[in-house]
Amino acid sequence: MTFYQELQLNQAGSKNLLKKSETLKEKLYHMWVYLVKIAATMAFCFFFVSIFSILFGKENSIVGVVVLLCLMVFRNADLGIHTGQSTMLLALFFVIMTVCPHLANQLSPVLGMLLNIAALAVLILFGCHNPFMFNQSTLVLGYLLLYGYDVTGKSYQMRLTGMALGAALTCFVFYRNHKNRTYKRNLNDLVQEFDISSSRTKWQLCQIICVPAVLCIAELCNMPRAMWAGIAAMSAILPFMEDMQYRVRKRIVGNIAGVICFIVLYFLLPSSIYTYIGILGGIGVGLSAKYGWQAVFNTFGALAIATESYGLKGAVGLRVIQNVFGVVFALIFCSMFYWLMSKKKETVVTVAAK
């Protein structure tokens, strides 16, 4: 494996190489490559988001984050269908992420929930056909981030331009990297494979209904940063209940641990470098291959931003409450939904047998 090829590995792949190292020299080499990868990734991410902030305004730095997520994911990931159709779908996804979160913010929580359901239905049914590629961690997360950091007026006009540029970049990179791949399925196959009795479709419907419902309830309760609850729910919803229960536990424990670590750093470090706690969290995520540790370090960046608006006590309280609410609601909702679907299937089988 070349140096460049090793740089392309994810955290799990890099750590697997470290475990398999037979000599100290080999282990040190793989560790060096791993650290270079993290440093290069952090530097590139910082530079990329900074460029978007300069071009489209600080309030639109989140656009840089969303575009960066899409570029890094879809340069390798696909939608499982013909490349040309996938490219057009990606362009449509960017239109949805640009327009629908903004419109939903102008509506009441209930009407906003209905619009969010319609928007997520397109993103998930056509962009997240394979749950184990975790495209929802890009598309739905991007949607929720843009929803949570909404802007108006001139700033929204700049957001339109930034998202248009992001769509062009993502579609170009995606098509270039996938144009020579052969896919037997097309858009029509995705529609035909919609089956309410399959674990995939039930998972998709849970994402489509549950995440907007969580946002709506949080907003009706006047809870700031409702997107945190939505992101927590999205992250926890998986096709199998055993996996989902594991994620709920890790999300709750990880967030509480992350909050404690953040508070310790907040009081130990001088106020002039508080903003760098978020960068430290990003490095931690880069070093983490397991979901629980990622939940710990993701807390750093969220709290570093929220503390400026709500103070330490308010930000910490919101983070814990929103995350616990999001994952617990998702677990209860999906448990009931999966149970109802299984009962419906049993009824259909019984009627057919008679």
Sequence positions of predicted segments:
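Alpha-helical transmembrane segments and their membrane-interface boundaries
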Residues: 1-137, 141-297, 304-354
